Amino acid sequence: MSGSYYLPVREDWLARRSEPALDPDLPIVDPHHHLWERQGWRYLLHELLADLAQGHRVVATVYIQARSMLRAGGPAAFRPVGETEFANGVAAMSASGFYGPTQVCAGIVGHADLTLGAQVREVLEAHLRAGGGRFRGIRHSGSWDADASIRNPAYDPPPGLLGRPEFREGFAELAPLGLSFEAWVYHPQIPDVTALARAFPETRIVLNHVGGPLGIRGYAGRQAEVRAAWHAAMTELASCPNVRVKLGGLGMRINGMGFEQGEEPPSSEALAAAFRPWME
């Protein structure tokens, strides 16, 4: 994947399509969004509020870690707590009612390095203190592929992360604190999530982005093969009662659907047709 891992936001391109909300009275909790400010692009509270004002009734949102507003100093293990402090500040702004009825960042999922083993408990407790009662869990990415050009350089875990003893030692600290785990992996690692869920049946696991089916580089042109492997892995994962799956996140470049290459954004019908095989 050449260039930046993330696509630039093209407001002029996005403006080429507008559709009315399908069910404007349906209450929605957005379970997965980020807030950040990076060089050349910004998506903070006001940008999120602009998107929320497009006709849907979004009553609350859940903030998911994205390496945003980390602490600038102090022990490295505790720097991700800065992101929880930031998200909780946004939540407090939203809770004032000044910005409208949506409870933004009503839930917060942060990051902690679970390979710290049992020592990660201090970091988890710091997140809970910083979260103002909103902190719900940890995301520690296991998204790895042998092709380094597919991997996100911001989250470049070693292969087999979820099965490593030090990771599992840290993972064991989640359930006693009532915390869940957000699993962000590519589809070849779904069996690792299944093994983790079976080893820790008391821990709630949320699989991100439908398991991250890949469709670029060596996976390009192999959709039937990828889907067969993905389907088999997801069927096995479905036997774990402590796992839930987020239905979304299929429009990224790594999925290979090519939406970003169109003259205009895809319609809701086009998105539904493309996503249907991964969600039915």
Where do the PLM segments sit?
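Mid-domain alpha/beta scaffold segments of enzyme catalytic cores
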Residues: 1-177, 199, 217-221, 227-228, ...
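Catalytic pocket-lining loop regions of alpha/beta-barrel enzymes
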Residues: 157-280
